[in-house]
Amino acid sequence: MRRLLLLVGAIVFVDTMFFAALTPLLPHYVDEFGLGKAGAGVLQAMYPAGALVAGIPSGMAAARFGVKPTVLIGLSLLALTTVAFGLADSVWTLDLARFLQGVSSAFSWTGGLAWLVAAAPAGRRGRLIGSAFGAAIAGALFGPVVGAVASYTGTGPAFGAVAGLAVVLAAMAAATAAAAPERIQPLRALVDALRRNRKIQTGVWLTLLPALLFGTLSVLAPLRLSDLGWGAAGVGAVYLVSAGLEAAWAPVLGRLSDLHGRLPPLRAALASSALVALLLPWPANAWLLAGVVVCAGFAFGSFWTPAMSMVTDAAEESGLEYGYAFALINIAWAPGQAGGAAIGGAVASATSDAVPYLSLTVLCLMTLAALMRYKETAVPLTAER
């Protein structure tokens, strides 16, 4: 189990590392290609758009061919598209490469996490998802560092190194044993589960909402910090601190959700996210804004582990393949991340940063009010030591 956790953790680490590497480079691409906030939002949105398009195909691949082939497709595509992104010399090639990286991400995450959860005892599911997600956040932590390095060395060499890591991980995954699907579950099972299972519906929404929050933050915060005088290294440092706190917290949060249920940490995440989203538009000092951004990352990131665990709990209860469960998570995350980046950037460009942030505050408060009336239908799992 530990070896599999390390492998899956490494896969999602590399994936999120490259996803987050764009953040400190956004001001560079804005200057080089003349992108405004809307154009920067579109570039950020290409990755989750690719994940959205590949969400269902990745689940079908895991259900039909198995988790290992799904992971290998994702890692192979990541290696190719990372090199392409590093060498891109126009807006359309950047956008296309970023879109295909999102496709690769859907396959890597769906296959990797389904592989892990299928092998996990039910009482340790939250902890293992939290540990894997902690590794993913550590990748997001290191990603801005890669982006900052790329701003000095050039994107080709920096992103070429990331592609090399993907190739190494593909070789390791190929050498690791994985069970083949015992039966082929039709796509109709996913549709039926999403339509009929209230817990899956709730978990999907609680995956989409933080994606909206992070998508908006990923565009507006770096550009605002740049306006206040900070360069790529400073922006990267802010996200480094934020992701470090998230990475340390995710496994603890997973264990807490195993012990006490999925809803208490989700309610806390909603309340804290509403507060920081309310505060984000106002700081006029870079250091103060940096502190609020760190708090925002911690609050927004507190959704992922309990929300994903809620979806996998419901999948097990309804007999849904885990590959389909994580396909649903991808389908929920992708439009949120893309919508937050593209719509948040466009709305802020047309009005001000306050409008998208305050709209998200209202969404968090409305969801919290609804969740206060929601009751879990299953008792908390007994956490295994």
Annotate the PLM regions.
Residues 164-182, 370-375:
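C-terminal membrane-cytosol helix-exit motif in multi-pass small-molecule transporters
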Residues 131-174:
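Helix-loop-helix hairpin linking two adjacent transmembrane segments in secondary transporters
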Residues 48-56, 140-141, 243-251, 337-338:
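Residue-level signature of mid-helix packing/kink "hotspots" within the transmembrane helices
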Residues 1, 177-205:
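Juxtamembrane intracellular "pre-TM" segments in multi-pass secondary transporters
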Residues 97-136:
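Cytoplasmic helix-loop-helix junction between adjacent transmembrane helices
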Residues 81, 92-100, 287-295:
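Paired small-residue
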Residues 53-89, 257-263:
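Conserved MFS/SLC helix-loop-helix module at the cytosolic interface between two early adjacent transmembrane helices
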Residues 108-120, 303-317:
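Intracellular juxtamembrane helix-capping segments at the cytosolic ends
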